[in-house]
Amino acid sequence: MTQANNAVYTDISAAQLVEEAIRRGEGELAANGSLVVRTGHRTGRSPVDRFIVEEPSTKDAIAWGNINRPFPADKFDALWARVEAFNNAQDHFVSHVHVGSAEAYYLPVKMTTATAWQNLFGRCLFIEPEQYNPAGKDEWQVLNVANFECVPERDGTNSDGCVILNFAQKKVLIAGMRYAGEMKKAMFSVQNFLLPERDVLPMHCAANIGEAGDVTLFFGLSGTGKTTLSADESRYLIGDDEHGWGEGVVFNVEGGCYAKCIDLSEKNEPVIWKAIKFGAVLENVVLDEERVPNYADDSLTQNSRAAYPLEHVEKRSEKNLGGEPNAVIFLTCDLTGVLPPVSILNNEQAAYHFLSGYTALVGSTEMGSGGGIKSTFSTCFGAPFFPRPAGVYAELLIKRIKAFGSKVYLVNTGWTGGGYGVGKRFNIPTTRGVIAAIQSGALIGAETEHLDIINLDVPKVVPGVETNLLNPRNTWADKAAYDEAAKGLAKQFIENFKKFEVSDAIKAAGPQL
């Protein structure tokens, strides 16, 4: 540890970071040993405050628009200098971590934060290597100064906070942001831009591995079940959110998990429950007077979170990676109650549904989405994090699926028996039954039934799952109402898909009217 007038705490232990956070009034200890913090008025990501510096390497390679907003290079340099000078005048924390577990694909990152707790968060979520940057790669810098306030008129930002990626300089600037998920997603976006150049598909998915070495991927937006379903006591966890798929390997981009905590229970999510202990960070979780977390309390936000390192998960892949996936699962939370609990997809359907990314925003991670639930289409099941045009990722996915022979499934973790407010949400044990059947190989070559309007094939039998749930039309009391809802959903799919320039075979793989 180096001390100066303004102390710089470099690569100190997790215990020391917890100590510093409490000493500075950044958070408090919960009864389970975790550090509990509040993130202020931002309790989720702030997409309107995220920018990418426009320069020669990015100018023609990025899908510019509302998600990827351009930022002038000169404005970035001025703001970086301003934030860095501000931070150098106060105590701060530095850690050296990797982003990407596979030797060939890691990025070395110098992470500087103004708060001890955000440094601990980064240490939970990124990878603490035994040896830092053994290959001597160019270093990335993350500068995360939560107590700096941007001035839009002066700095060119949208508000008092910003997240700006600069690929030319290998820098990520985060200012005025207390919600630590911004740091994790910023580095994910960096890898999502860089990995396709190496013929690696970056994915917003969870991954786990069975005793036999079989790997399953779970794609899905926040709240669809990635973290919950991949945390399976019978399998080894690779990771819960960000992975790369290259020839012969699926590897975690991270070294930890970022689990939603709302209504967390030991019964339904034992792996996550046990992982929340000393060294973990709880964001925006309410404690009772005994300091016991009340996970049902959403008075601060629906998007309460736990960050913990993979070492807190007993059954995990020691190397943070596995082989190529036998099963690829697209998780969708369907609010309409139209989609079946499981559909078996061919390659064209896989491309169609990957590009569509249909789901719901459930207890959304984005600011301004409120507690309301609404349907959305999020390309690649993670549009906010993929800087290149969607076709780049879709082509890589199909290339990988074809080369390895992965089987692809669409799994609905949303509503059945009617839409939101009428039907009910599939319970976790039912969805776990579907996943277990997929992983056992029981659905390979299974007899299927074709559902016309939504153009999906559903297995007639899924071991461990009630047969009457498999065809969603059967679960609706009013069959005509189901048909109308199915047509309505098909229209949404068709309308959304107009923006993609793809082959007729892929277009024909979606819902038809």
Curated annotation (Swiss-Prot):
Mn(2+) binds at K185, H204, D241. Substrate binds at R45, Y179, K185, R305. Pfam families: PEPCK_ATP. It is found in: Cytoplasm. The keyword Metal-binding applies. Pathway: Carbohydrate biosynthesis; gluconeogenesis. One of its GO terms (biological process) is gluconeogenesis. PROSITE patterns: PEPCK_ATP (PS00532). One of its GO terms (cellular component) is cytosol. InterPro entries: PEP_carboxykinase_ATP (IPR001272), PEP_carboxykinase_C (IPR013035), PEP_carboxykinase_N (IPR008210), PEPCK_ATP_CS (IPR015994). It comes from the Bacteria. Its EC number is 4.1.1.49. Keywords: ATP-binding, Cytoplasm, Decarboxylase, Gluconeogenesis, Lyase, Manganese, Metal-binding, Nucleotide-binding. This is Phosphoenolpyruvate carboxykinase (ATP).
